[in-house]
Amino acid sequence: MAKAVGIDLGTTNSVIAVMEGGRPEVIVNAEGNRTTPSVVAYKGDERLVGQIARRQAALNPQATLFEVKRFIGRRWDEVKDEAARSPFTVKEGPGGSVRIEVDGKDYAPEQVSAEVLRKLVGDASAKLGQKITDAVITVPAYFDNSQREATKQAGEIAGLNVLRVINEPTAAALAYGLERKGDETILVFDLGGGTFDVTILELGDGVFEVKSTSGDTSLGGADFDQRIVDWLAEEFNKEHNFDLRKDKQALQRLIEAAEKAKIELSNASETSISLPFITFDPETRTPLHLERTLSRAKFEELTADLLKRVRQPVEQAMRDAGVSSSDLNEVILVGGSTRIPAVKRIVKDLTGKEPNESVNPDEAVALGAAVQAGIIQGDSNLGDIVLVDVTPLTLGVEVKGGMIAPMITRNTAVPAKKTEIYTTAENNQPGVEINVLQGERPMAADNKSLGRFKLEGIPPMRAGQAQIEVTFDIDANGILNVTAKEKTTGKESSITIENTTTLDKSDVERMVKEAEQNAEADKARKERVEKRNALDQMRVQALQQIDENAAAPQDAKDRLKAVADEAEQAVGSDDDSRIAEVQGRLEEELRNFMTQNSAAAGAQEGAGQPGAAQDQDDVIDADFKPADDNK
């Protein structure tokens, strides 16, 4: 059976891992790195993913997509302010969804994320020597139903069978607690590139039980970067009266410099930011440069409100779990942004514990996902591990007066199922519309509507007489299904989401086909590049042979040089048949040249030996063993 993998599909970077010999191991990518930037770039028909995409971002800002996880499964009205700060075009799509426009074509965030997944799985398949089809993918614990569905769809578009969608902090706890014995209560503090989660778990006897979770899906390292971007832009504007954020290329350079400065300030008290030729004076066309020094103290001042936002979810999670700082055995830090010194100080202040840094914050989530994949596949090395997770937000329906009637409250263990009986509000009401809500506010309008569906065909009866059985069913992925049944007639309806941010089945199928076609095109493109490279290498080898064999007959050198020149022209062309034809001729000419010179060299060597025949036509090539002086 092919191995299943665990994937941390991150905002900034992504990681893939697999169980090997009872232990989860990170699989390095084709470039030899353990993390892959979650960056996708489009250049004509070509797609670049990972580090190669990140490297060309400054020159291709409008077609280089990053931090797309912040848009996945969300509505346009939730992200339009964030979208305005992006170097690429993010706009409203069908039904209030989000789309990213590149060169006149619209992409769903799920499609872009699928490219990252395809790169991870493709590289891992090559490393493992087997095609990977099954995966566990992680999501922030505070992701809502739409975001979870969209993440699962990204996996399907990438050609994966998504075994499970699990929460990132829970996965990190699996990685941490895999080989630990005894009972522990731990707090996982997960501050990544775009999201923030806090989860409290109890560990013991192979059981990982989540007691509470809280978070903020709009808080992460990118927000800290943005504060540096804004500061740099405002400082430059004061000096030159020009807002760099209006120049897409300059903005991309600011974003890259801000992230670099943030990372450096984790280990240094100040850092220099140098961006020469950041733009040109609009009047004189002389180049303008940006030079600034940013201290850690100034960085903490710029991000003071973000640091304050970190506190509330920690306090909420501890309150919901009914634990105090003295009840916590360990505090685990996950996510690259936990390296920020001010964040570590806040964690210590809130929990009274020195954070445990024994797990790699960049890899722990993927490692835990690999453990979950192993559990699902029945890996005998893992023993009896039981994972009990919870739903992060309250789920309910809208009732009379615009209120929310909770069905499943936050921090309920999943999978979970709950049924309630509702009735009609008016006489002879022929049907009801059920508005499914997610959130903690008492009024329906203040919570997120996951979707609406109708139950028709209710027989005429007085208000309050109809009995409508509504069932909420959350699966192990945290994904919700809702059904409604009128008990008198037995009529039943299940949720059909209207104006959803997720894709319908036909969209997913179309995108899967597109992704497969793209993969075939990518393979063909790679093969063409490899053929060009092979011809170019042979051309270089031919020129080296000419240089190294100066005494060779001039006509032989001229013939080889002529075909080598043809090869140079063919490499620069887009004609595959010409490349193949020239390669065949160059191969033959080079072989003849090397054979002729090898024979000539052997003849010269023989002529230099005592008693050798003077007629080169009589020379016989042979391998002689050295004489043994002792015989």
Swiss-Prot record:
The modification Phosphothreonine is found at T195. Residues 622-631 have a biased composition (Basic and acidic residues). Residues 593-631 are annotated as: Disordered. Pfam families: HSP70. Gene3D superfamilies: 3.30.420.40, Actin, Chain A, domain 4, Substrate Binding Domain Of DNAk, Chain A, domain 1. Induction: By stress conditions e.g. heat shock. Acts as a chaperone. HAMAP family: DnaK. This is Chaperone protein DnaK. It comes from Deinococcus proteolyticus (strain ATCC 35074 / DSM 20540 / JCM 6276 / NBRC 101906 / NCIMB 13154 / VKM Ac-1939 / CCM 2703 / MRP). The gene is dnaK.
